[in-house]
Amino acid sequence: MPTLRMPNINQVALSGRLVQEPDFRFMDNGAARLRGRIAVNRSYRDRNQEWQEETSFFDIILWQKAAETLAKRLHKGTPVFITGRLQSHSWRDSDDQPRFRVQVQVRNLQVLERDAEDMQEENVQQETALQAA
């Protein structure tokens, strides 16, 4: 009887909004890195058939040319669609406590169109910042 091989699949696709300003920097080895976090909302009906909202947060990371190119376009509130793979990290912190993190290594990122209300709010914020300067 042939051995059944399970495929190794590690793919993720998410759409959401950046919840903070991304952190762009060059690493000691010269690699460009962009880190951020997105919020993904899910609506569902509970047992009483009432609509509920659930929000999940995911750390994302981009490298090299993609990081450099998107660093100026991505800001808090930017809607994005990403595809990539999950990568886990474990370490011990300064108190010798075990820590664990899963982040999305982004392969493709598409900035989604903002709706008119978002654009109007951003324009008001930009105008306010200019007036304050």
Task: State where each predicted segment sits.
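A beta-strand/beta-hairpin structural motif
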Residues: 46-72
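Hydrophobic residues on conserved beta-strands that form the core of alpha/beta folds
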Residues: 33-35, 57, 106
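Beta-rich strand-turn-strand
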Residues: 63-99, 112-115
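ABC ATPase A-loop
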Residues: 7, 53-55, 104
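A contiguous, mid-protein "functional segment" used to position or interact
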Residues: 98-99, 103-108
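Core FKBP-type peptidyl-prolyl cis-trans isomerase
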Residues: 12-53, 100
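OB-fold and OB-like beta-barrel modules that bind single-stranded nucleic acids
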Residues: 13-18, 38, 76-88, 106-109
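Acidic, gly/ser/pro-rich intrinsically disordered tails
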Residues: 1-10, 24-29, 45-50, 72, ...
